[in-house]
Amino acid sequence: KKSEGTELVLRNLKSGKETRYAHVVSYHLSEDGKHLVYAAASKDSTADGLYAINTNTRDSVAILTGPADYKKITLHEKGDQLTFVTNRDSFGAEQQEYTLYHWKTKAKAPTQIAKFGTRGIPSGRWVSEHGNLAFSKDGKKTLLWNSAQTGNRKRRRNTQR
């Protein structure tokens, strides 16, 4: 069953100014508070997408949009890049397949890093939407989970960026 998000309110505590974002299912704030990233979803999928907000200017960027689930959004501690998984390419199919993406705040679009069949993902395994993602301290590597169709999970390091 597709979930529908709720309203997220971003309030500047000094000025009291509020900005509201509809259909939010998950959100993440960078450690320095300068970047807010959120996933949106609506029952009819028209609002589905992943968005980034500069909290100082309130400028918004659509990272990736379209009918899908956007999960495991992970910001690097500096807030200048993120990784996430989505089933955008298989949304609505009986068997959902997730793809790992990487995005930098200055990039126009995210980069596809891994999915079923890519180098670094063992044969018969695919990107899992259940495991956590993590960045290395320097932000040059991403740690991801991949799983077999049986549901067994195994940690793999993916250095293809």
Question: Where do the model's predicted regions map?
Answer:
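Generic hydrophobic/packing signal
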Residues: 12-17, 31, 40
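Blade-terminus and WD-like Trp-Asp/Gly-His loop motifs, strongest in beta-propeller folds
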Residues: 1, 27-37, 73-82, 127-128, ...
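Short loop/turn segments that connect beta-strands within beta-propeller blades
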Residues: 12-16, 54-58, 104-108
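A flexible loop/linker signature enriched in serine peptidases of the S9 family
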Residues: 1-7, 18-22, 39-50, 64-70, ...
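Hydrophobic, small-residue-rich alpha-helical packing segments that form membrane-like cores
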Residues: 51, 55, 76-78
